[in-house]
Amino acid sequence: MAHKKGVGSSRNGRDSNPKYLGVKIFGGQAIDAGNIIVRQRGTQFHPGAGVGLGRDHTLFALVNGKVEFTTKGPKKRRTVSVVAEA
């Protein structure tokens, strides 16, 4: 007879931390230069006028203005641009 109870081991019990991806500032909203518009993996959204692309594909505003989402070209690329307020 075993003196200790056999303890099973599970191969589950791990999870990764949340990455908080997605659109942070929506179309028509005001934004300041340097603020993040979209956090993404890969370029689901492409940068347009007044928008920069970070090393991790984050889109951020280069100028103060209003955010504008559009689709362009035959590939229907979703572009984000910041229209400077006059």
Swiss-Prot record:
Annotated family: Belongs to the bacterial ribosomal protein bL27 family.
GO molecular function terms noted in the UniProt entry: structural constituent of ribosome
Record HAMAP family: Ribosomal_bL27
Keyword match Ribonucleoprotein: yes
Organism: Xanthomonas campestris pv. campestris (strain ATCC 33913 / DSM 3586 / NCPPB 528 / LMG 568 / P 25)
NCBIfam families cross-referenced by the UniProt entry: L27
Keywords from the named record: Ribonucleoprotein, Ribosomal protein
Name of this protein: Large ribosomal subunit protein bL27
Pfam family, one: Ribosomal_L27
